[in-house]
């Protein structure tokens, strides 16, 4: 038994499931999770001393690679002044100004501590601004673990929300309606059903929590038109795509402007940071100046702001990174497609820039239903086979792979050889 197994045995006695976020448990894989000791660049090192090429990137924040020198130095410098003050600081103003100066659709922004908080707050603001209650989300799109967002489609698209977690009263979700991703007709049908009471449509501009599912051509533009037609706000959940696909996120990448946007992951550079922002007339409803209440003891924490602002400034000043990540994505995911073709395997690769997924299904994956057709047992064996070769990916068929600046062509080619080796067995 290795140290990871020993730690997991200890953890399950004092932490539910042995982890502090479910996907870390490797529950779908059937082995003990790797406990990580340190990370650098595109590599992580577990407590047993094993080295892995990492394609999780801490679930997205580490776009510059682990332990990036400028970010680390900014944190150490900020720590010298203290960890938290419970008062306003200069750096949270600098962070907000930087975002508003460089993201055209964000006039005002409020910092929070997670993507979940960002979504929860943005939905509340949308309801406050419109005076309406209904929210439309999409099956397979994850928007954090607030009660109103933990909803499945039930018996069909036209069904009002049914809680997808124990402990969530039906009353918390009855105003949440679930549409089919990439299906504008399903959205229009729900808006008609809501009879003018749709406050907002919230969407992952790139589905990244059912595996990676790109929007079909015209889908996001169609959502924009439907929201305008029915008097609803369009919320882009850019917790994953924000500052990753382009500096302006999916909104810039696809050329579609939301009314509100939520951020997480990259905005904190590995620290617990989220944010939501949008048009001034909407954001001015947020307390203390407006009637929509939202607060947080550690929101705008100076250590987290130092890390996040340093990373955002670096990304803005080096926007060639985004072209580089696009090319890395073509090299990795395109290379995987070639291997599947060589081996005559009917599986599918979806990718958008640095985000990608290998789906163990013969179907083209365009929504949650087609994603669920994947053979999760086959994925589990693939994950274990790649881990044995020193490649660390998300331990779930329904999570994304993330590339970072630190993934070199050489590392990507080594990864492709590992893929080829696995499918040659």
Where in this protein do the model-derived segments appear?
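Conserved N-terminal phosphate-binding loop of PLP-dependent enzymes in the Aspartate aminotransferase
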Residues: 1-425
């Amino acid at each position: 038994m290795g140290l990871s197994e020993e730690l997991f045995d200890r953890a399950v006695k004092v932490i539910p499931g042995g982890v502090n976020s479910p996907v870390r448990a490797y529950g779908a894989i059937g082995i003990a999770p790797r406990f990580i000791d340190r990370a650098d660049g595109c590599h992580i090192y577990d407590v047993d001393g094993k080295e892995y090429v990492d394609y999780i990137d801490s679930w997205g924040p580490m776009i510059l690679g682990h332990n990036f020198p400028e970010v680390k130095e900014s944190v150490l410098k900020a720590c010298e002044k203290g960890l938290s003050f419970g008062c306003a600081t200069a750096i949270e103003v600098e962070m907000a100004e930087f975002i508003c100066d460089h993201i055209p659709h964000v006039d005002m922004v409020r910092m929070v501590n997670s993507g979940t908080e960002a979504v929860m707050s943005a939905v509340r603001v949308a309801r406050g601004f419109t005076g309406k209650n209904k929210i439309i989300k999409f099956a397979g799109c994850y928007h954090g673990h607030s009660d109103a967002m933990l909803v499945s489609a039930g018996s069909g698209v036209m069904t009002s929300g049914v809680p997808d977690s124990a402990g969530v009263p039906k009353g918390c979700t009855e105003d949440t309606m679930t549409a089919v991703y990439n299906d504008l007709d399903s959205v229009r049908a729900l808006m008609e059903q809501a009879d003018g009471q749709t406050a907002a449509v919230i969407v992952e501009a790139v589905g990244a929590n059912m595996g990676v599912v790109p929007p079909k051509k015209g889908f996001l533009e169609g959502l924009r038109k439907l929201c305008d037609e029915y008097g609803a706000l369009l919320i882009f959940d850019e917790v994953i795509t924000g500052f990753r696909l382009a500096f302006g996120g999916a909104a810039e990448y696809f050329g579609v402007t939301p009314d509100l946007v939520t951020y997480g992951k990259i905005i904190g550079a590995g620290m617990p940071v989220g944010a939501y922002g949008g048009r001034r007339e909407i954001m001015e409803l947020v307390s203390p100046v407006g009637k929509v209440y939202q607060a947080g003891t550690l929101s705008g924490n100076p250590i987290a702001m130092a890390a996040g602002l340093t990373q955002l400034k670096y990304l803005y000043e080096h926007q060639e990174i985004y072209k580089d990540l696009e090319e890395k994505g073509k090299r990795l995911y395109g290379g995987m497609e070639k291997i599947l073709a060589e081996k005559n395997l009917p599986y599918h690769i979806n990718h958008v820039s640095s985000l990608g997924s290998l789906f163990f299904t013969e179907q083209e994956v365009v929504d949650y239903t087609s994603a669920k057709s994947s053979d999760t047992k086959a994925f589990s064996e693939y994950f274990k086979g790649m881990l044995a070769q020193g490649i660390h990916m998300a331990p779930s068929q329904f999570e994304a792979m993330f590339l970072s600046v630190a993934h070199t062509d050489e590392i990507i080619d080594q990864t492709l050889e590992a893929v080829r080796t696995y499918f040659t067995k």
